[in-house]
């Protein structure tokens, strides 16, 4: 059983930790020893790339309105932490550059792009801050993944999937593997409720690195780790650490990755081409 990559979803954003997609959440995640933080990016009206999941700031700030209809200076007036707890009042919506500055040499940034046209801007910021070898870019959009691979094929990419096709595991795996290969993704990132052992095994046979999102229940964490997934995305890295420690104490899991490997996402996925699997059962 492998030790999966630990990814803090929007930072350490679970209850009792920190408000999502803020510098406080990313700092807390790093303090908890995660391998990576997952962030969502959008652009302001004046073109600044900021970290925000929703298309509006209504849910996670004390103000309202679409991100792309406000200038960066207007967004900075919003309080992005007070809704979570008084101790976080005054947290601001961070820029992508601020997050890259925070995680540089400390953790990998898994950047989810919400619009295809942001791909080049994200890569430019990564190059400007000198973290291009410390990022993974993911998207539900095949076009975004293709675009990243075309602009900078050295950057690992992850293709996000929610529900899987309703067909037998082998057929689903064949179809999904073809799609992953077609878009050039290095990693398949699947919603945990759609991930089954037969499907995972078929993907493993085809050489596909599989991550899963967003896993917050400790029992589910244990299940997917024992299944063999290569990465786990969670709002609760504290719980994930606890589960991994339990499995390590039980002798059921390999030791964690060394620091040098943790900061090199290019080593997190299988670089060989996705394989075709014979329908005939292999002996033994």
Regions found by a protein language model. Give the residues of each.
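Phosphate-group recognition and catalysis centered on beta-loop-alpha active-site segments
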Residues: 1-284
């Amino acid at each position: 059983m492998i030790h999966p990559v630990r990814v803090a979803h929007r930072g350490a954003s679970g209850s009792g930790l920190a408000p999502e997609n803020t510098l406080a959440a990313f700092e807390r995640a790093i303090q908890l020893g995660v391998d990576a933080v997952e962030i969502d990016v959008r652009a302001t009206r004046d073109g600044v790339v900021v970290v925000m999941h929703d298309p509006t700031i209504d849910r996670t700030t004390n103000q309202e309105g679409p991100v792309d209809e406000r200038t960066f200076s207007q967004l900075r007036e919003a309080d992005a932490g007070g809704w979570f707890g008084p101790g976080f009042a005054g947290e601001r919506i961070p820029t992508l550059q601020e997050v890259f500055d925070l995680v540089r040499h400390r953790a990998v940034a898994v950047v989810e792009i919400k619009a295809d046209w942001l791909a080049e801007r994200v890569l430019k910021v990564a190059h400007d801050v000198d973290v291009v070898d410390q990022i993974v870019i993911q998207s539900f959009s095949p076009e975004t993944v293709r675009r990243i691979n075309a602009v900078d094929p050295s950057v690992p990419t992850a293709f996000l999937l929610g529900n899987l096709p309703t067909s037998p595991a082998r057929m689903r795996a064949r179809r999904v593997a073809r799609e992953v290969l077609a878009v050039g993704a290095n990693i398949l990132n699947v919603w945990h409720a759609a991930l089954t052992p037969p499907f995972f095994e078929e993907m493993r046979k085809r050489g596909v690195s599989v991550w899963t999102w967003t896993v917050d229940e400790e029992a589910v964490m244990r299940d997917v780790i024992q299944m063999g997934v290569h990465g786990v995305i969670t709002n609760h890295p504290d719980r994930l650490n606890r589960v991994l420690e339990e499995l390590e104490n039980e002798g059921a899991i390999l030791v964690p990755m060394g620091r040098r490997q943790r900061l090199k996402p290019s080593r997190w996925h299988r670089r060989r081409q996705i394989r075709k699997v014979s329908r005939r059962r292999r002996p033994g």
